[in-house]
Amino acid sequence: MGRFIFVSFGLLVMFLSLSGTEAGVCCPFGWSGYDQNCYKAFEELMTWADAEKFCTQQHKGSHLLSLHNIAEADFVVKTTVSGSKDGVIWMGLSDVWNECNWGWTDGAQLDYKAWNVASNCFIFKTAENNWSRTDCSGTHNFVCKSPA
C-alpha cells in the first residue's frame, strides 16, 4: 500500500510539473500560460509596427503584449522576458491607430496604467516594472500575447 501511494504521488508531481505554468491554460508549444492567455517572448529586434505584425502572424488572436494588472506584469517579467537584452520590450499600447486615443492592439480596454511621459508607442521596462512612451521606429525585443 505504501508503495502504491509513493508511486501515485510521484506521478502526480510529474503531471503537475509537465502541465504548464497554469493548469487549464492550453498554449502552443513554447508559449507560457497565465489567466486564460498565452505569452511568448521574441529576442528579435523590431520596430513597433513590425513586432505587432509579427505577433498577429504567430497565433490566432495574437498581438503585442497588453497588461491589465501588476500580477500579470510580474508573470511576464518572471517567465517570458529573461531573453530581453536591455530589459525593454514593446507593448501593444499605442495611439498609432487612434490618434490620441490610447488602446491595446488586441482591442482590450486600457484599465491599468503605469507610464511616464515621451512619444507614440510604449515600452515595458521590465527591471523597473513600468512603462515609457517612446518613438515607434526604435527597435526592441517584444512579447506576443494570445487568448488561450
UniProtKB/Swiss-Prot annotation:
GO terms for molecular function: toxin activity. InterPro entries: C-type_lectin-like, C-type_lectin-like/link_sf, C-type_lectin/snaclec_domain, C-type_lectin_CS, CTDL_fold. PROSITE patterns: C_TYPE_LECTIN_1, C_TYPE_LECTIN_2. Disulfide bonds join C27-C38, C55-C144, C121-C136. Glycans are attached at N130. One of its GO terms (cellular component) is extracellular region. Keywords: Disulfide bond, Glycoprotein, Hemostasis impairing toxin, Secreted, Signal, Toxin. Residues 34-145 form the C-type lectin domain. Residues 1-23 form the signal peptide. Interferes with one step of hemostasis (modulation of platelet aggregation, or coagulation cascade, for example). Belongs to the snaclec family. This is Snaclec 6. It comes from Bitis arietans. The lineage of its organism: Eukaryota, Metazoa, Chordata, Craniata, Vertebrata.
